[in-house]
A protein has these predicted regions:
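Acyltransferase
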Residues: 135-165
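Beta-strand-turn-beta hairpins that frame and shape the catalytic cleft
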Residues: 127-132
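Hydrophobic/aromatic beta-strand patches that form the interior of the parallel beta-sheet core
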Residues: 35, 112, 133-135
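Flexible gly/pro-rich beta->alpha loop and the following alpha-helix that scaffold active-site loops
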Residues: 1-35, 48-49, 53, 154-157, ...
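Catalytic nucleophile loop
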Residues: 41
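Pocket-forming structural segment of enzyme catalytic cores
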Residues: 48-122
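Conserved G/P- and acidic residue-centered "switch" motifs that form tight phosphate/ATP-binding loops
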Residues: 38
């Protein structure tokens, strides 16, 4: 598979890649709930056979650690829209230099959000799994995203509490 870069100027960490691909495969094979964030969304896409755009200018964090911001369109009817309370245009943070557009998307994954200005996919989900959602933004940086993005963590906890091996 393709290597997942950790950021501009950061060396690829193959042991980390192998560990994360193995952990994701373990979870997917058991239909465990998965929430991918940033690199996690990229990892999900590559693990399903997709690829990445290796360098996307204008999406990485500033030198002072601040996030870039942009609008993302969440598709109505998607799992992500259900978690967020509806499809809409949301203002989110951006801290990544890799990503994907529809041509790089794994065909078995659905793009459930994208950036209208440049077509960068901002969220993926797997229709073959109960709860596999991945977002390019960082919802853990709560002050930089709408409050309903915290529902991603609530949804993960809810699905994890129902998970039976």
């Amino acid at each position: 598979g393709q290597q997942i870069d950790q950021g501009a100027g950061v060396e690829t960490d193959l042991p980390r890649d192998y560990l994360e691909f193995a952990a994701l495969e373990f979870a997917l094979n058991r239909d465990m709930p998965v929430l991918g964030i940033c690199r996690g969304m990229q990892l999900l896409n590559v693990s399903f056979g997709g690829s990445l755009i290796q360098d996307i200018p204008g999406h990485i964090a500033g030198e002072d650690g601040s996030s870039q911001v942009h609008f993302t369109y969440v598709s109505p009817g998607s799992k992500l829209a259900a978690v967020l309370g509806g499809g809409a245009i949301y203002r989110v943070n951006s801290r990544h230099h890799q990503g994907l557009k529809d041509p790089q998307r794994a065909t078995s994954l659905l793009a459930s959000a994208y950036m209208p200005e440049d077509g960068i996919v901002e969220a993926l989900e797997s229709p073959a799994h109960s709860w596999v959602i991945a977002v390019q933004c960082h919802p853990e940086r709560a002050k930089e995203v709408p409050t309903n993005f915290q529902n991603l963590f609530k949804g993960l906890i809810d699905w994890a509490s129902r998970f039976k091996q």
